């Protein structure tokens, strides 16, 4: 079990009052203006409306203040979503890219748009391809196969393009690392324009233009664009129009790519995604319309969360399980009947992806049960035969969530060649860890939080040992990243209207997460199964007010709390419209016994380190070393009540927060003696 600490953000009360007043005044003035009354409001009416708006906007102002946004002007600009999109020409080499593309159009050359097999790559390809078509260009598009070609521009792809007589390649969402491939293209007489958003290597590829906001010498102000975002800027530059005008034509594709690639939803991305989601709701693209219909979102407001959990996985599934061309065909499809067929096919592929992912996840869990010593590894390296390489990265992510440590999942083919995909946790550089074992690998790549590798089967045991040796030296105690809580709440002060006001903070995503609230000293009043028992719906009561909240992935029989327990809950809040009217709803992220602070997660990390043989300071040892009487107390508690072995938080709470580490060590000792 991973014990996670919570971090409640500090709150400047004076700044909160000032910001609440500013937001309330703005809202009141808008209400007065929209009322279009014949006479200006009286002072009494204005004051009454202002007081109501102060109450309704207090929750919104609290979240903004907790996130450090205390300047009223900055806050009101953010809430209005009015951040301007910067001039595309500020991107270094954008002028060179446009000049070469214009010349190709004028001279009737065939332009090849070369993309990638993920959502960002597919949407970027469709976006640029369709825009060039609209400009009258002769254009083709090409996507690599995940298994056959691998990521990015390859020599085989360049040779194929050359053999078809094409002389200009424009990459989207890839190419920044294609140094050798760029040289090869030049040898064949092919001009190359690179548009990408990934971190460049020390030496840039030699190309006609290299457009990447993350170039060291790039002069554009915003560095958080995804591949589709860069392609969007290229289209605006080619048209010579403000990027805001381009939003009406391809903002939907740019928004899907941005959200799916987990780019920060701040700055220009916030403006782009906000506009793109509105366009997506009323899209005139038959392919996207069919996909929305397939996932039950037709005619409904589309959120960034809908893109992340419903739209993006289906587009991604094609590249993972089959061929990304299927997804590209859907996005660009203009025939509604054909679009419906393709959307249904993608849905079936995604279902297969989910089934395959679950099979591998269960196999990995069985491996851990058969070899429990792997649970002591700082970096978990798990391997199996013929696991589908398209989903091992997703499985690694799920295992990271479950174990709280870096995980690499490896599939072995019939030739003994292995491909691995790893995911990390904050504070642990997985790329550096893997790089320290480079002599055992065929190749590797990635970054601190995610990496991939290729290795021979016979080197896997040595790789596991070396990964953990490096981790023991460089990161002996791995603390779980705390769950950031924005604001403590009291249910009797939270209304449907105040929660609706939070919609102004959307779209939510990377660097702009859904607000997390801390509900303290709530009584667990009810537990109900959801989705055939896969999830739990809890009724939490605080004073005379209560809220129903769903805990996804927590079956009722595994819930480590009983009716009547007093708990603290970290949760999101939303509003749903029921036959009985609008009601508050919650989504539980974590649950602690009431009053249990950060000591549980902190001392649990020391216990894990002790079990792994990591040297601890005398002070750390003292914190977690139980006396004989402590072990006796724990034994009696275990005999008196059936505590869940997967979650001992309630037991730790009962025996005292300051004794958390001692309790966990005592449980471990009792497990070892049976």
Regions found by a protein language model. Give the residues of each.
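Conserved acidic residues
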Residues: 167, 208, 568
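Short alpha-helices
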Residues: 127, 206-259
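Short amphipathic alpha-helical segments and helix-helix/interface helices
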Residues: 158, 182-183, 667
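Terminal, basic amphipathic appendages of nucleotide-handling enzymes
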Residues: 1-48, 66, 70-80, 84-85, ...
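Hydrophobic helix-and-loop "lid/oligomerization" segment in the mid-to-C-terminal part
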Residues: 3, 10-13, 17, 41-42, ...
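Acidic, two-metal ion nucleic-acid-processing modules in DNA metabolism proteins
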Residues: 133, 138, 270-313, 317-365, ...
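Histidine/acidic-residue-rich, glycine-tolerant segments that coordinate divalent metal ions
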Residues: 172-225
